[in-house]
């Protein structure tokens, strides 16, 4: 099981605004800012997002290779997948595939996929057998 993921973004303020909008339908919020000076030498400043008291998705400013990561966010139902996709598109995402069944994985696998402003692949996913 994963505990957290860091991604590097080219414009931290733009990315915070994007993720605040895109993740809101999933009840994932910008939860904490971490000052790198509080960590070991060379630790980056971080902007953390999470839900239910757990921070698990972190942004850091830097040089980007946006196609190097794919992140899937859990939705609690089909309406949340649809809402997250719509929010991400309204916030400037680029479409990879609109919401729908991903039959190549499983007929019950419902998801949408977008690219964030840095080109990262984001998936909003609902798997009814995992809820």
What is the predicted role of each segment?
Residues 5, 106, 113, 124-131:
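Short beta->alpha transition motifs characteristic of CBS
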Residues 1-16, 71, 128-131:
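N-terminal beta-strand motif that seeds the catalytic metal site of vicinal oxygen chelate
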Residues 55-60, 113, 122-125:
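Conserved beta-strand in the GNAT
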Residues 11-14, 72-117:
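Vicinal oxygen chelate
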Residues 8-54:
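Core segments of cupin and vicinal oxygen chelate
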Residues 38-83, 90:
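Long, continuous compositionally biased terminal/linker segments
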Residues 31, 57-58, 96-99:
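A short linear hydrophobic-aromatic micro-motif
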């Amino acid at each position: 099981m994963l505990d957290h993921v860091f991604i590097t973004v080219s414009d931290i303020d733009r990315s915070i605004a994007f993720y605040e909008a895109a993740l809101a339908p999933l009840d994932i919020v910008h939860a904490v800012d971490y000052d790198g000076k509080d960590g070991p030498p060379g630790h980056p400043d971080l902007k953390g997002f999470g839900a239910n008291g757990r921070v698990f998705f972190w942004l850091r400013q830097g040089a980007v290779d946006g196609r190097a990561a794919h992140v899937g966010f859990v939705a609690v139902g089909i309406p949340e997948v649809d809402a997250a996709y719509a929010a991400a598109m309204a916030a400037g995402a680029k479409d990879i595939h609109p919401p729908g069944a991903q039959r190549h994985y499983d007929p019950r696998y419902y998801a949408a996929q977008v690219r964030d402003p840095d080109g990262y692949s984001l998936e909003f996913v609902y798997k009814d057998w995992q809820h």
